[in-house]
A protein has these predicted regions:
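Active-site-proximal beta-strand elements of phosphoester/diester hydrolases
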Residues: 209-214
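Gly/Ala-rich beta-loop-alpha elbow adjacent to hydrolase catalytic centers
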Residues: 114, 118, 123, 127
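N-terminal beta1-alpha1 cap of cysteine-dependent amidohydrolase-like domains
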Residues: 1-111, 124, 131, 135-163, ...
Length: 248
């Protein structure tokens, strides 16, 4: 059986190594790659540079699906807002690349899956906005502390893709201080936390365009491997159609 190729953008950050000064590194946390491979896909990693951005459309043509992984806050100026003081320093090159990959994949009929920041990127790419600092309004700001994942329950909406794959309620590891505010074009909220935060989105049609606000890569078996397997299956079908592969 063909393993579909899944594009993911790398993050750029300062890293330290024993005896060496800090240096900019393009990287992606290994659990994201492990999650894609556990679900049956192969990760294809793209650097968040202007050169890569110029080839974003060609990258999507070469792969079968796109995963937008977690990371720092999306630049608020991308959706027309002034940044909140609590926001991370932006990595605009990654924002631009992931938005381009997302829109090209949607235009090409290829599946898109967003995780945490990735769900927010999908929403922004389709014209939505974000709530920039949840601690300004939610009753439990400790749910989104820096430096740790916090478990909490999310409830899915019956009849949706996340409901079919994950059930009506699940306990998930979460780490974020931003969330979806207004939904992008053609998207609907399909899961919520107890504080009302949108925890999953998907397209209103039958296409596989899904985002989850939590981190399934941290506990795949109980928090999302099945939705990633569905994404990989949809990507494999795309590969079969585009490349003429025979399903076995």
């Amino acid at each position: 059986m063909t393993r579909p190729l899944i594009a993911m953008a790398l993050d750029r950050r300062l890293t330290s190594s024993e005896g060496w000064p800090d240096e900019l590194t393009d990287a992606l946390f290994a659990p994201y790659i492990d999650l894609i491979e556990a679900a049956g896909g192969v990760a294809v990693l793209a650097a968040s540079t202007d050169a890569t951005l110029a080839e974003a459309h060609r990258i999507v043509e070469l792969v079968d699906g796109v995963v937008v992984a977690g990371g720092r806050d999306v630049d608020a100026r991308t959706y027309g807002h002034d940044p909140h003081p609590a926001n991370d320093p932006p990595l605009r090159a990654r924002d631009r690349l992931e938005i381009a990959l997302t829109l090209k994949a949607i235009d090409s009929g290829k599946p898109v899956l967003g995780i945490c920041r990735g769900m927010q990127i999908i929403n922004v790419a389709l014209g939505g906005t974000l709530e920039q600092h949840l601690a300004d309004r939610v009753d439990e700001p400790d749910m989104h502390l820096n430096g740790q994942f916090v478990d909490h329950y999310v409830n899915t909406i019956p009849g949706t893709r996340v409901w079919r794959d994950l059930g009506s309620s699940l306990n998930v590891p979460s780490h974020h201080h931003q969330a979806v505010a207004t939904l992008g074009r053609g998207l609907r909220a399909t899961a919520h936390a107890g504080d009302g935060v949108v925890e999953a989105i998907e397209c209103t049609g039958s296409r596989f365009i899904v985002g989850v606000q939590w981190h399934p890569e941290r506990r795949p078996a109980s928090t999302g491997l099945s939705i990633v397997e569905s994404f990989v299956t949809a990507s494999r079908r795309t590969s079969a159609v585009v490349h003429g592969h025979q399903e076995v």
